[in-house]
Structure formats: structure tokens, C-alpha cells
Amino acid sequence: MTTNYVLVETCALVQNRFGMRAIKVFQEDIVPVLRIEWIDKAVHHAAMQVVIAAPRKKLSLVDCVSYETMRLLGVTTAFTLDKHFKEQGFICLPA
């Protein structure tokens, strides 16, 4: 499971590092097997409020949207190397 916000962030990263051919592979081979949660106005607003209220500048809107979505769906484990997910109480893989 992922969100459309993560897809946007991933596409930008893949395009920047690997080019358009990699974007095509990502879109055709990886995206179809993902469960995508499309973020609505309420989740976006809740995540944005966390970003604005946070005392640190390294907290991204995409991460906050992920936290909010995971909590709403009861997801407890994240595939991530981002330490912030562990700080938020999620189980991170790889450990």
C-alpha cells in the first residue's frame, strides 16, 4: 500500500536519478501491483497541520500524509529507511 503523494515523490526521484525510461518501467511494471490510497482534502489538511505545528524543518508533508493514512487504515509496518516512521511508532522494514 502506498499513497499518490509517495508516487509523486518517487517519480521525481526516479526521473532525476535514472531518466524517463526508468519512469516508464516504474509506471508499467511496479505501479499496477500497488494498492494506492488517494489522498483526500481531510487527510491533506490534517497532515499539513502537523507539518506547520512541528518544531523541526525536516518533517515532510509526504511523510505526514503517510503517517495519517497508515493510522487511519490501521497499518503498523512501513517499508522505509526513514527513521521518522520509527519515531512515530511504526515498525520499520528493514529493521
Tell me the role of every PLM-derived stretch.
Residues 1-56, 68, 87-92:
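PIN-domain endoribonuclease scaffold, especially VapC-family toxins
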Residues 60-76:
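Acidic, metal-associated active-site segment
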Residues 9, 63, 82:
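Acidic active-site catalytic centers that drive phospho-/nucleotidyl reactions
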Residues 2, 59-60, 82, 94-95:
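Histidine- and aromatic-rich ligand-binding microenvironments
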